[in-house]
Each structure stands twice: as C-alpha cells, then as structure tokens.
Amino acid sequence: MKSQTKSSKVNRAWLNDHVNDTYVKLAKLEGYRARAAYKLKEIDETLGLIKPGQLVVDLGSTPGAWSQYVRRKMSPKTATGGGAAVGALNGTIIALDILPMEPVEGVVFLQGDFRESDVLLQLEAEMKGRQADLVLSDMAPNLSGIDSADAARIENLVELALEFAQNHMKPEGALVAKVFHGASYDPLVKRFKETFLLVKRIKPKASRDKSSETFLVGLGLKPH
C-alpha cells in the first residue's frame, strides 16, 4: 500500500509539473505536439543547422515535434501564433520511429525498428541516392533502472545513429543525438570526437532540470 501511495504522489507531482510547464503551454499555443520542439529550436538557433533545401533525417521521431519544427524552418513563410507551416516545403524530411506517428504535412514517415536491416533499406530508398545534410536522433531506449544495461542500450542507439551519419551524411553535415549522463556518456563523447571535426554539448533550457539528458552535436565528418 505504501508503494502505491508513493507512486501516486510521484504521478501527481509529475502531472502538476507538466501542467504548469512553460514549454508545455508554449507547445500548445504554437501547435507543436511536444515540448521537445523547443530543445531542437534552441540547438538550431545556437548553431544554425536547419536551412531550406536540405535533406533531414529524423530518427526516433514520434510524436513528431522535431519534424514539425524542421517543416516550419523549410517553408518560405513560417506560421505565426500556432498551426502548420505555410507554403510549399523546400527540402526533404524523412522521419522514422518504431512507434506510429500522426502525419506531418510533407514529411515522409517510416514505421520500423532502426536496428533492423530491412528498415534501413527502406530509409535508404526514400533518400533516393542523396546524402543527408542533417541527421537528428531523439532515440531513447526503454530504461530498466539497471545502470549497466541501460548504458549499453543508450550507447547502442547512439552508435547506430553515428554509423548512419558516417555512411549517409554529407562530409559537411551535422548529427544531433540525445545522450544521457551515466556510464555511457564519456565513451560516446569520445566517439563523437573521433568522428567529427567539431563537437558541441548542449543541454537546452527546455530539458527538464531533473533530466540527465544532453545533446551531442557533431559538425563535419572526419575522413574515415
């Protein structure tokens, strides 16, 4: 009974934080599906990553807030006060997730497990022989609470995003990947530094204070 009471208190506290969250309110006002859009927005505004005409691959895309943000950046006219982007899409956005995603106008969505070769082949087919300008990875595993197992799962997903970027991204392109502080963090930073000419670590203001997430941004591939 005590555990149930504790759990309900935790759930109520989370719900209270969520309802009163500035970014949750802003997302509703501006028509984004999740507050995560503002994490990418800050990273983009800091580094100037997203430009019209690009090919952007969004890994771990559901519910679609990052794809929505990219979609708006690739329109000749951006919507104000919420709603969808205005005007034709100038660029290509391919989103992928193991979970379903409600359509985002102009975005190609593939549902499947990025770890499976046939899903990767579908993604390559949608790229039509082009290399990506930008790869986004908001992929995160289901965490077990066992540090060593969770670290391995996190590291595996980021390694897959790194491998994809090395093989399918322009040399001058960029990779944005979500990582978590813990046993996998330092090895992943090392891998990024081995792979990219410049590496930035950003914890956006929209990341919750209690969250251990950080985003690694790799700019420009080193020859391999």
UniProtKB/Swiss-Prot annotation:
InterPro entries: RNA_methyltr_RlmE, RNA_MeTrfase_FtsJ_dom, rRNA-MeTfrase_E, SAM-dependent_MTases_sf
Name recorded for this polypeptide: Ribosomal RNA large subunit methyltransferase E
Lineage top rank: taxon: Bacteria
Main function: Specifically methylates the uridine in position 2552 of 23S rRNA at the 2'-O position of the ribose in the fully assembled 50S ribosomal subunit.
Keywords assigned by UniProt, alphabetized: Cytoplasm, Methyltransferase, rRNA processing, S-adenosyl-L-methionine, Transferase
Active-site feature positions: 178 (proton acceptor)
Chief location: cytoplasm
GO MF term list: rRNA (uridine-2'-O-)-methyltransferase activity
